[in-house]
């Protein structure tokens, strides 16, 4: 979506639940966003030009302390050059450093031109757009250029329609800021010692007469986060992406009768990307894999998708009954091919010359990653209506996914059924209720497991430069993941201007494929199991109001609330070990985390539960103990201590839109209520003594 020119979009609609899954497959099990792009209009040629400029600055920053200077334990002895636990600063020693000053004013320039023309039989649309952005972090750039063409033609008394389109996108970026510590200049900016002069490091490189090159100036040291001069990261740790993408589409539809239509569509989406990473000499050796000469990496991933479908659409009335039927078949083929080369620049190489010939022959790594997935499908949906007040909806889809090759289940079927009734059309309601509909549905959606689990594959060992077979235990009977969902809902319109929607849902997911880290002999290192049972249950509420005064001023407001409760009903229970025949039971699974904070799945818990196995040492009264040296004492390898769940209790949103004589003003407020947040940024700031807390 981010690659699409906003001026090319005609409308955006959202499909949810079974309707999305029936048309677009298991990838749309949670819904689908359908974007309709513009087409040419009948009439005189129209040319539209638009231009806008956005400015950005950091809005909310962490709270920093500027009372204590460089050092540790209240002293400045020169041994702790990157900590701010030093002596109290005074007017003479206070530098007045403000991290906000590191950031630039970000600017984004967007310019576009569109052309529309057409006759009753042929319509043409063309657009060109450019987005040029300079980020708030120094030396961060993003550019995108879009070119779009679409032509629609009618034949045979408008019964036959041909629609063709083409888009070409050029995108390049430099130093997009990522999360983590090593390649993120914000880390040393936030943790910079408060007793040092930040202005001195703005000249981030100095001439090294011995090496005859400029090297990084960073007297503060790397610390345990491998920090570098933030300006060196911005200007001498370069990461660039250059992407070219083209999309071609064609559709042909024919109206056999006024109630029967057939159509066929094909879409091709290809992208070619070139990624480069250049780390200059004297960069942190953790990043350069030990080289003081620098590091170079290049990768060229190519991605392609071909989608095609045929559809038959029926829309007919039979007296009091209406029938809408869609029957079709589709195929989608995804391919990925990446060739990459990386390594440190050799000791006798030329510093800061970035090409594959200058890499260390003993450490350079060449890789190629290639895969293909294909899914063939047939699907159908039918909606039977009675007197425009009662509707029965049925959908069904069967997928043959390549991930299921060599398994006992080579395809999977997922159906749905829904019933809705417009009560306001059936009985007379109080005058305050303009519209009332109740609805209920059930759907069962399948999802294929990861590719190559059931097909023999080999992986390349970069260390030994040999091919090795995958070492997971031979898999027998694997089945697709399955989610069964129930939903009940109510939609109302009150007092002409109010809208109310309420939904309750229950979703059970099982047959999940994962590696529970159980012991396997016979030379295998892992075994994949299909088990698990996770439940999601919740409610969604929406309330809206819209009114127009004197045909000029309109106010529209919408409030939404959602609450979801996630619960792990079962992890691994009575799974028979294929070697020993013994039952396997697991009610705890560590799925990773950051530092001492770990996401641990437990029966009865949720997927967002966060635990720790470290705590501060406390006395018999529960008070935190302090060592004779004045340091906190930590105790590791404790039983799981639950910190909480990262899932919120509910999500809230409130939007307002005001319009008056062509002027529009809008505002959106969102909130997450409940749930915990683990901030590695806050933890690092506390450790280095720069946070206000």
Which residue ranges define each predicted feature?
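Short acidic/polar hinge/loop motifs at secondary-structure boundaries
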Residues: 1-17
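Non-catalytic regulatory/gating segments with a bias toward low-complexity or hydrophobic composition
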Residues: 12-13, 33-35
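Conserved C-terminal beta-signal and adjacent last beta-strands/turns
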Residues: 114, 556, 645-673, 693
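Extracellular/periplasmic, surface-exposed regions of secreted and cell-surface proteins
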Residues: 86, 106-109, 144-145, 150-156, ...
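Conserved small-residue
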Residues: 48-93, 178, 340-342, 529, ...
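Residues embedded in well-ordered regular secondary structure
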Residues: 1, 31-32, 39-139, 176-180, ...
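Extracytoplasmic gating/loop element in the C-terminal half of outer-membrane beta-barrel translocons
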Residues: 87, 99-102, 231, 285-286, ...
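Short beta-strands and strand-coil junctions in structured, solvent-facing domains, enriched
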Residues: 18-23, 40-43, 55-58, 135-136, ...
């Amino acid at each position: 979506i981010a690659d699409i020119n906003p001026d090319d979009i005609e409308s955006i609609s959202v499909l949810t639940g079974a309707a999305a899954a029936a048309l677009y497959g298991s990838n749309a099990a949670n819904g689908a966003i359908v974007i309709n792009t513009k087409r040419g209009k009948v009439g005189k040629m129209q040319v539209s030009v638009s231009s806008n400029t956005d400015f950005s600055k950091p809005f909310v920053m962490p709270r920093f302390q500027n009372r204590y200077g460089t050092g540790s334990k209240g002293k400045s002895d020169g041994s702790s050059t990157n900590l701010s636990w030093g002596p109290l600063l005074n007017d003479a020693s206070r530098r007045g450093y403000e991290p906000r000053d590191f950031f630039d004013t970000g600017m984004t320039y967007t310019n576009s031109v569109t052309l529309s023309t057409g006759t009753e039989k042929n319509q043409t649309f063309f657009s060109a757009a450019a987005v040029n952005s300079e980020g708030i972090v120094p030396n961060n750039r993003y550019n995108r250029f879009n070119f779009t063409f679409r032509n629609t033609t009618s034949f045979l008394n408008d019964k036959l329609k041909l629609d063709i389109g083409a888009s070409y996108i050029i995108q390049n970026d430099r130093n997009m800021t990522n999360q983590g510590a090593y390649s993120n200049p914000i880390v040393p900016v936030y943790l910079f010692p408060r007793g040092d002069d930040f202005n001195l490091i703005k000249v981030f490189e100095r001439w090294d007469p011995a090496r005859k090159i400029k090297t990084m100036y960073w007297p503060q040291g790397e610390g345990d986060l491998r920090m570098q001069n933030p300006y060196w990261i911005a200007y001498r740790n370069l990461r660039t992406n250059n992407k070219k993408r083209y999309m071609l589409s064609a559709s042909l539809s024919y109206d056999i009768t006024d109630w029967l239509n057939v159509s066929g569509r094909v879409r091709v989406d290809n992208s070619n990307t070139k990624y480069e990473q250049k780390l200059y000499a004297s960069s942190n050796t953790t990043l350069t894999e030990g080289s003081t000469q620098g590091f170079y990496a290049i990768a060229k991933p190519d991605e392609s998708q071909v989608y095609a479908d045929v559809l038959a659409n029926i829309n007919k009335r039979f007296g009091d009954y209406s029938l809408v039927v869609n029957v079709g078949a589709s195929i989608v083929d995804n391919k990925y091919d990446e060739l990459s080369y990386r390594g440190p620049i050799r000791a006798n190489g030329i510093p800061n010359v970035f090409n594959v010939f200058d890499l260390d022959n003993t450490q350079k790594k060449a890789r190629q990653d290639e895969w293909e997935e294909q899914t063939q499908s047939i699907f159908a949906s039918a909606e039977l209506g009675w007197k425009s007040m009662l509707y029965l909806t049925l959908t069904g889809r069967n997928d043959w996914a390549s991930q299921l090759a060599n398994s006992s289940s080579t395809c999977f079927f997922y159906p749905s059924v829904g019933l809705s009734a417009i009560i306001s059309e059936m009985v007379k309601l109080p005058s305050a209720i303009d519209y009332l509909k109740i609805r209920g549905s059930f759907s069962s959606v399948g999802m294929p497991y990861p590719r190559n689990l059931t097909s023999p594959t080999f992986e390349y060992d970069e260390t030994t430069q040999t091919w090795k077979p995958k070492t997971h235990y031979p898999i027998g009977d694997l089945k697709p993941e399955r989610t069964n969902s129930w939903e009940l809902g109510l939609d109302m319109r009150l007092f002409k201007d109010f809208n109310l929607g309420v939904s309750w849902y229950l979703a059970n997911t099982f047959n999940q494929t994962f590696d529970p880290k159980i012991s396997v002999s016979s030379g295998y290192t892992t075994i994949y199991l299909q088990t698990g049972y996770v439940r999601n249950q919740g409610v969604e509420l929406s309330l809206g109001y819209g009114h127009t005064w004197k045909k000029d001023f309109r106010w529209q407001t919408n409030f939404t609330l959602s609450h979801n409760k996630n619960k792990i009903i079962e992890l691994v229970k009575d799974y028979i070990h294929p070697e020993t025949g013994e039952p396997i039971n697991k009610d705890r699974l560590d799925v990773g985390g950051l530092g001492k904070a770990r996401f641990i799945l437990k029966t009865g818990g949720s997927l967002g539960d966060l635990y720790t196995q470290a705590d501060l040492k406390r006395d018999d009264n529960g008070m935190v103990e302090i060592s004779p040296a004045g340091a906190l004492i930590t105790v590791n390898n404790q039983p799981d201590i639950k910190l909480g769940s990262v899932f919120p209790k509910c999500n809230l949103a409130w939007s307002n839109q005001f319009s008056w004589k062509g002027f529009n003003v809008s505002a959106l407020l969102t909130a997450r209520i409940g749930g915990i947040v683990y901030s590695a940024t806050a933890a690092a700031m506390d450790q280095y003594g720069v946070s206000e807390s």
